[in-house]
A protein has these predicted regions:
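Soluble N-terminal domains of membrane-associated systems
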Residues: 1-96
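Electropositive phosphate-/nucleotide-binding environments in soluble metabolic enzymes
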Residues: 7-11, 28, 74, 78-82, ...
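Alpha-helical transmembrane segments and their cytosolic membrane-interface
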Residues: 73-140, 230-239, 250
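C-terminal ends of transmembrane helices
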Residues: 104-107, 151-162, 210-223
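Core alpha-helical transmembrane segments of integral membrane proteins
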Residues: 113-186, 190
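Generic detector of multi-pass transmembrane helix bundles and their immediately adjacent loops
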Residues: 185-255
Length: 255
């Protein structure tokens, strides 16, 4: 096989794995994808190391190459993971070439499955419905609808400008708590607790924590530990943001 073609195959498989890890995929799923794609082209002596922050791919042959990819940011996008799986299956079955697979992967990484406004609206309605579920009324529904969309939007803006997910969650939870209290003061919302809990739901790392537990179950202890600790730290950042807001308002005369 031509050396350039070999490099192209490895980079395509690595790219598929990168998109999956960035989108919150479990480690074992990303490793399985990269191994299947390479095995379909005759590369059977492959070693991989996948974690939430780095991917290492190497050929065990004496003159084999080694590839390393850093993952600076991650999110949760199950639709993107499914789309990569579809490309991987087509590639393994020989339905598409390496170049076609790479082009499809680039499209998957750059496109959004839904318009941003629709994602915000869906998030807001879901969080507002949860506020009703835990004891709120229609005024809490309206307040939570607004504050949860604000939380999602703030988190997206801050995470785009920062390399840490903790800052966005802290500032987001702090600001939406302030807005929720102000809404409560003007009569928009009768249950402040329901409004705040519903408002911070977009920030809660439920998928990340679940992925970490699944990594533990499949024996990927490093990835499982990293994901779970990250999820716990995000939860602490959210709680700290809400706590700071409540403490300050209480110090200023109470709620």
């Amino acid at each position: 096989m031509d050396v350039n073609e070999e490099v192209k195959i490895f980079r395509t498989a690595l790219y598929a794995c990168e998109i999956m890890v960035k989108s919150g995929s479990e480690t074992y799923r990303a490793e399985d994808t990269i191994k299947r794609m390479l095995a379909s082209k005759g590369f059977l002596n492959i070693s991989t190391f996948v974690s939430p922050t780095v991917i290492i791919l190497g050929d065990n042959l004496k003159d084999g190459n080694c590839y390393i990819k850093n993952i600076p940011k991650r999110s949760s996008n199950l639709a993107r993971i499914e789309n990569v799986n579809e490309v991987s299956r087509s590639y393994v079955q020989g339905k598409i070439s390496t170049d076609e697979a790479m082009e499809k992967l680039k499209i998957i990484e750059n496109e959004s499955p839904y318009p941003y406004w629709l994602m915000c609206l869906g998030c807001g309605i879901s969080c507002a419905a949860f506020a009703i579920l835990i004891g709120g009324n229609y005024t809490d529904f309206i307040a939570t609808l607004i504050t949860s969309i604000l939380a999602l939007h703030l988190n997206e803006i801050i995470n785009a400008a920062s390399n840490t997910v903790f800052l966005g969650n802290f500032i987001g939870s702090l600001i939406v708590s302030v807005v929720a209290i102000l809404f409560s003061k003007i009569g928009l919302g009768s249950s402040l607790e329901s409004t705040i809990v519903g408002s911070v739901l977009p920030l809660v790392p439920g998928v990340a924590f679940t992925g970490g537990v699944r990594d533990f179950i499949t024996g990927d202890l490093i990835s499982g530990t990293a994901r779970c600790i990250e999820a716990i730290m995000i939860g602490i950042a959210i709680a700290f943001g809400v706590g700071v807001c409540m403490t300050v308002f209480n110090a200023l005369g109470g709620l």
